[in-house]
């Protein structure tokens, strides 16, 4: 009986031990399965945490950018490369670069001024007291080249007046006077716009008395008046006739004074290094004052003016009347009054 009991107990213990080992094996397998399933879950959680952190960082960056944009509304956003720090070497390079640029500009201006000075010596305009400006020099050179090209194209010697008008086209009045003085002409003789502006009764007087000195003075310029002309350099000028004013005082008709004759219009001057040559020069007799030869009989004056007859008993007398006292722009009536006053003073002077 005891043997059987012990055997049964041994069998029960063996069965219980086998069941325990099976349970241990099964529990270990379950733990392994749990570990295998929990690992991806943990990885997923870690990934979610990283994504959340990244998302938070992105949101922070966006907020910072928005704040910067709000701040940029008040100040303009600077573009381009960042400003480098100024060092001594960079400052020295900048200084040398600036000095080289200044030297290049200085040389360029010196060359331009030298070229303009050479051009001033070639164009037909020279003055010791007045120097042409840059724009006037270029305009005069352009007109001079165009006029010479027209002469070469036509092959004929042009009229002096047309040549001077083409030469002075578009120039200012002081430059025109300088050109006229260099060519020994009066600006009033070849400027049609001046004669158009004058009244009709003054145009004839201007044409008759163009031998008067003419000067043009511009305010603001330091140089003396330009283009002062002498009567000895005016061509084709016919003085006013004073014979009709003297006829009432004498028995015979007086002859009018005539100007010396010239060969014709001069050819345009040729400029070679600033020297101008003409075909011929005006006569020296033209430099003298106009002389009025008065022929009268001594017997004709004896009845009315006894003392005047004894004073002017010669056959012919020569009377020189100053031109500055006669020549004016008032018309014929003023000249007649001047002549009457002078003759009365001569005849009644004792």
UniProtKB/Swiss-Prot annotation:
Keywords: Activator, Cytoplasm, Developmental protein, Differentiation, DNA-binding, Neurogenesis, Nucleus, Transcription, Transcription regulation
bHLH domain boundaries: 96-148
BP GO annotations: axon development; camera-type eye photoreceptor cell development; endocrine pancreas development; inner ear receptor cell development; negative regulation of Notch signaling pathway; positive regulation of transcription by RNA polymerase II; posterior lateral line neuromast hair cell differentiation; regeneration
Keyword Cytoplasm listed: yes
Localisation per UniProt entry: Cytoplasm; Nucleus
GO molecular function: DNA-binding transcription factor activity, RNA polymerase II-specific; E-box binding; protein dimerization activity
Biased composition range(s): Basic and acidic residues: 22-38
InterPro entries: bHLH_dom (IPR011598), bHLH_transcription_factors (IPR050359), HLH_DNA-bd_sf (IPR036638), NeuroD_DUF (IPR022575), TF_bHLH_NeuroD (IPR016637)
Function: May act as a transcriptional activator. Differentiation factor required for neurogenesis. Acts as an upstream activator of isl1.
Protein name listed in UniProt: Neurogenic differentiation factor 1
Protein source organism: Danio rerio (Zebrafish)
Classification lineage: Eukaryota, Metazoa, Chordata, Craniata, Vertebrata
Gene that encodes it: neurod1
């Amino acid at each position: 009986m005891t043997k059987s009991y012990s055997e049964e107990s041994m069998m029960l213990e063996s069965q219980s031990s086998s069941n325990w080992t099976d349970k241990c094996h099964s529990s270990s397998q379950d733990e392994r399965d749990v570990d295998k399933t929990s690992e991806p879950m943990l990885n997923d959680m870690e990934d979610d945490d990283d994504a959340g952190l990244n998302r938070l960082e992105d949101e922070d960056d966006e907020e910072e950018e928005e704040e910067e944009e709000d701040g940029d509304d008040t100040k303009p956003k600077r573009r381009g490369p960042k400003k480098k720090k100024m060092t001594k070497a960079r400052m020295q390079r900048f200084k040398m670069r600036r000095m080289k640029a200044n030297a290049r500009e200085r040389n360029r201006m010196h060359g331009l001024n030298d070229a303009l000075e050479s051009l001033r010596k070639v164009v037909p305009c020279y003055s010791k007291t007045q120097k042409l400006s840059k724009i006037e020099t270029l305009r005069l050179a352009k007109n001079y080249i165009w006029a010479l090209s027209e002469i070469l194209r036509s092959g004929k010697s042009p009229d002096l007046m047309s040549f001077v008008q083409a030469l002075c086209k578009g120039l200012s009045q002081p430059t025109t006077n300088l050109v006229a003085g260099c060519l020994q002409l009066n600006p009033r003789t070849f400027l049609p716009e001046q004669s158009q502006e004058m009244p009709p009764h003054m145009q004839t007087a201007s044409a008759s008395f163009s031998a008067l000195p003419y000067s043009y003075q511009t305010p603001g310029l330091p140089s003396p008046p330009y283009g002062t002309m002498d009567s000895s350099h005016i061509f084709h000028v016919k003085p006013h006739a004073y014979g009709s004013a003297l006829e009432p005082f004498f028995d015979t008709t007086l002859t009018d004074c005539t100007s010396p004759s010239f060969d014709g219009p001069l050819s345009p001057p040729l400029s070679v290094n600033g020297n101008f040559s003409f075909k011929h020069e005006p006569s020296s007799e033209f430099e003298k004052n106009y002389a009025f030869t008065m022929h009268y009989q001594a017997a004709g004056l004896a009845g009315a003016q006894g003392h005047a007859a004894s004073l002017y008993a010669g056959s012919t007398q020569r009377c020189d009347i100053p031109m500055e006292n006669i020549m004016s722009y008032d018309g014929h009536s003023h000249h007649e009054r001047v002549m009457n006053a002078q003759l009365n003073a001569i005849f009644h002077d004792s």
